[in-house]
Amino acid sequence: MVIELSRMGTYHAQTDGENQDALCCGKSRDYFVISLSDGVSECREAKRGASIASQAITNLFLKKGSYFLEFDEEQIADFALSHILCELQQEAEHSQQPVIDYSSTVASVLVDKRKKRMLCFNLGDSIILAVGKGRCRVLCMPSDSSSGCCVTTTRLAEKMVSVKLCEIGSMESVIICSDGAWREMFLKNRLKPEVAELLSNNAYDALKDFLTGQNCFDDFSFIALDMRHELRRNSA
């Protein structure tokens, strides 16, 4: 089951802007994919770029998941980002806009239901968390954005992608959070106690309520995949 939240923050609301986060998900017989992209506010086509990036990586992982799960981390970063950039360049050429106008972060999780393996891909300042047996842990940290966040159109961005291949093991769910969301969920590099409790119980509807009550400055989004039912069914 996929649970989603994506809302505009107060900054874009006050400036007559738009929510520049984009979510995407898909499933096939063997795979689940969830993805999140956050458009760069200063870019003219940020929302469109985020939508293209999240859709491109979702479709790529669904179609070529078996290959990506056998690649090494460098190959995963290179091939996935090259595909996204190709999609962005096609859109830019069609619209006669600079490709940099379509810049965004992109994060995605590919789950192999049968082999119970997972691939996490993260470019930019989103975070990917796993939940299982009442505990939460970080799978992919956000990049350090103190000197500027690396995005899809950044030169040599593939060198900055965080990739993790792992066994699902005791994981029950996985969640991708935009920076606007996770900054409200963490305090001094630790999950706030109330958020940790929600996550440990896979209470994502309650997490929606928590975030919408925080008066977030930035757009805030998450996409979560609760794997418990599907994995039990595949194990039967």
Mark where each language-model region is.
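PP2C/PPM-type serine/threonine phosphatase catalytic domain
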Residues: 1-236
